[in-house]
Amino acid sequence: MARGALDWIGAELVALDAKGLRRSLEPIGPAQGPVVRVGGRALVNLCSNDYLGLAADPRVRAAAADAAARFGAGSGAARLVAGDLPPHGALEARLAAWKGREAALLFGSGYHANAGVPGALVGRDDAVFSDVLNHASIVDGCLLSRAELVRYRHCDVEELAGLLARTRARRKLVVTDAIFSMDGDAAPLRELADLCDRHGAMLYVDEAHAAGVLGPGGAGLAEALGVQDRVDVHMGTLGKALGAFGAYVAGERRLVELLLSRARPFVFSTALPPPACAAALAALEVVATEPSRRTRLFALCARMQAGLARLGFDVARVASPIFPVVLGTEARALAAAAALRERGWFVRAIRPPTVPRGTSRLRVALSAAHDEAQVDGFLAALAEVLPGLPPEPRPPA
C-alpha cells in the first residue's frame, strides 16, 4: 500500500523521464562475458569492466566455489569482531606484494574505500585536491572528510601547483583516478608525485580501471610509470579486471594500521565474503602467469582506437580499454544505444550526472575475451547508426 509521504516521488520520476535521465536495470545472463543475453537476445557486450575476461573464468569460479565449501558463503561479521577469516589475510598479503607495498587492507567495494579513506587522513583543518573528473565516490569521500575540497581542472598540473602553493591547510591530500572511468585517459602520475614531494602533500591514486591492465606485472599505472614508491595510498578494486568483488588499499604498514581504526566503512561493515577473496586470489595468479591477456587486450584497443578516430571521435588521449564515444545530448546517446542494440551490440548510454551536461556518450569497454571481428563489427554498426541520430541542438544566436 502506497504511503502519502512518498507521493512527491511520482513527479520526480516524471521529471527524470522528461530529461532523459531516468535509469533502469537491465538483467543479463547467463554470466558475464563478451556475449550476453539481454531481453532474450544474444548481444556483444561492450559495456563491462571485465577487462581480462576473468569474471567467468573456470579457475576463478572454482576457487570461489571451493572457498564457499571451506569457509562459508559469508563472513558473518566485521573483520574487527569475528569476521577475519584466512582468505582475507592471504589476499591482503598477495595484494601488498603485487603493489610493492608493506601492507594492504580489504574494503567491501571501491565506493566504500573512496568514501572512507580520505576521512581517515584529513579533516576540518586540512585540504584535499581532487581532479574535476574523479569518480563520484572520490568526491563523496572528500566531502565526508570535512576537509576543504579544492577541485582542479582535469589533469592540469600547473593549476594544481598554484593551488598547493597558496593553501594554508595543515595537511594536504591530492586524489586522482589513475584511469578516468568515463574518458579512458591517464593521470599524469609522475608530475603529480613531483608536486606532492615539493609541497609535502599525500598522494592518493585510485587504480580501479588500471589494476590488472597496465604495467609489466599488471599492477596498474603507478607500476607502468615506475612511481609505486611515490604514491602514498594505492586504492584498487577486485571487481573489474580481476573479475571478483571488493576493493583494497595498499601502502605503508602504518597507513593500514590507521585505517583499521579510522576508516569507518571498514570498521562498520561485514567483511568481504570468503568466495570473493578466493576468486580474487585466483585472478591474481592468472594476471601473473598470463601476460598474453594484456597483450591481446591492447592489440584490440589499438584497433578500436584507430577505428573510432576514423569516424571522427576524439580518442587520442585514451590509454586504456575505455573509449568515450561522445555524442552530446542525452537523446543522441540514448538513440545510438537503442539503434546499436537492434544490430546486436550491447552498449549503454552514459548521461548526466555521471558525465557533464552536453557530453552524453556511449562508454565502449573492451575485454581480452573479445576478438577482432567483434571490434570491426561494432565500428561498422556505429558508422551505420551515426547519420540517423537526432541532430545536435543549434547554439543560441
From Swiss-Prot:
EC identifiers of the protein: 2.3.1.47
Reaction equations catalysed: 6-carboxyhexanoyl-[ACP] + L-alanine + H(+) = (8S)-8-amino-7-oxononanoate + holo-[ACP] + CO2
Pathway: Cofactor biosynthesis; biotin biosynthesis
Enzyme class: transferase
Name used for this protein in its record: 8-amino-7-oxononanoate synthase
Keyword Cytoplasm: no
Cofactors that this protein relies on: pyridoxal 5'-phosphate
SUPFAM superfamilies, A to Z: PLP-dependent transferases
Single GO term (MF): 8-amino-7-oxononanoate synthase activity
Keywords: Biotin biosynthesis, Pyridoxal phosphate, Transferase
Lineage, opening ranks: Bacteria, Pseudomonadati, Myxococcota, Myxococcia, Myxococcales
Residues with PTM N6-(pyridoxal phosphate)lysine: K240
GO BP annotations listed: biotin biosynthetic process
